[in-house]
């Protein structure tokens, strides 16, 4: 039974990747004239269980990236052929699909026998320099343990007890609360630093961290209450450059939580986190959840 479920899950996720990859085609435009469009670049869509990024290259080769409830980062490669507005998609894993599409205002609508899918064109490169405001966050997770136990020990002569976190503490409501409280206003600078205001009972607190962007990956690093932390996740930007999407799976969201976890130590004075401690926490976190995915959205300030 377990093998059957696993097989069905694999097939379903593969089909999602195939269905979502038909956007690299020659499409009908909004005036119904069939034209060959240059669809090179990045396209993005989201369903109930999958955040999907599609990349089309000059040679009509395709790469489909996704973060789903059941998987970490995954990519599927393929190619397409076009005949008018009829397209055929072929993937290296043996899957294929045919369909048609239309495009209006940089929105691709994909019509297949299995339904309709809409993709938004993204910017080819991400540039976050400027002021941003929190917009929204979506969350999906399933805990398989009630607790996350962060190992203790003696670090730099300080006896640090194990820390126990309830997985219920890391629910969608907690994520939304934290995002609204800690990332209401964000400023990205040209020098690779970012500043944001934290809402505290006694007033706003301004914090500064470092950031870097390499293709689809963004890394944020710095110190939280004296603890060195870093997290790398996927970053995407809308075609008009006014919306940015930060996408986390359970491995890299664990890195973001390490600062919060360390604050639970008595007095908040635990020594700087080591690679060993970070790996122990990430292991405990990922083992506590079947899946955990977050999409954090910000809009450019007006």
Across the structure, where does each feature detected by a protein language model lie?
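Bacterial N-terminal signal peptides that target proteins for export
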Residues: 2-14
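C-terminal motif of bacterial Sec signal peptides marking the signal peptidase cleavage site
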Residues: 22-26
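Lipid interaction determinants
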Residues: 30-77, 83-206, 214-302
């Amino acid at each position: 039974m377990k093998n059957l479920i696993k097989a069905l899950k694999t097939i379903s996720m593969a089909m999602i990747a195939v269905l979502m990859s038909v956007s690299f085609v020659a499409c009908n435009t909004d005036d119904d004239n069939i034209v060959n469009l240059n669809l090179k670049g990045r396209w993005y869509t989201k369903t109930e269980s999958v955040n999907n990024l599609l990349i089309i290259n000059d040679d009509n080769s395709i790469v489909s990236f996704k973060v789903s409830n059941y998987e970490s980062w995954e990519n599927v490669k393929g190619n397409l052929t076009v005949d008018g507005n009829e397209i055929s998609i072929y993937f290296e894993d043996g899957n294929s699909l045919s369909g048609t599409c239309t495009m209006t205002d940089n929105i691709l609508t994909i019509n297949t026998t299995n339904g309709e899918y809409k993709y938004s064109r993204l910017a080819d490169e991400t540039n976050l320099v400027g002021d941003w405001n929190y917009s929204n966050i979506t969350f999906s997770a399933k805990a398989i343990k009630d607790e996350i136990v962060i190992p203790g020990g003696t670090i730099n002569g300080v006896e640090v007890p194990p820390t126990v976190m309830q997985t219920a503490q890391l629910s969608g409501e907690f994520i939304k609360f934290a995002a609204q409280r800690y990332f209401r206003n964000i400023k990205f600078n040209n020098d690779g630093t970012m500043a944001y205001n934290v809402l505290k009972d006694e007033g706003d607190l301004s914090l500064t961290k470092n950031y870097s962007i390499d293709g689809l990956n963004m890394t944020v690093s710095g110190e939280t209450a004296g603890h060195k932390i870093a997290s790398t996740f996927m970053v995407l930007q809308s075609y008009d450059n006014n919306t940015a999407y930060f996408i986390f799976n359970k491995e890299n969201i664990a890195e973001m939580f390490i600062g919060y976890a360390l604050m639970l130590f008595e007095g908040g004075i635990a020594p700087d986190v080591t690679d060993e401690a970070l790996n122990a926490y990430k292991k405990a976190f990922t083992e506590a959840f079947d899946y955990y995915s977050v999409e954090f959205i910000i809009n450019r300030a007006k």
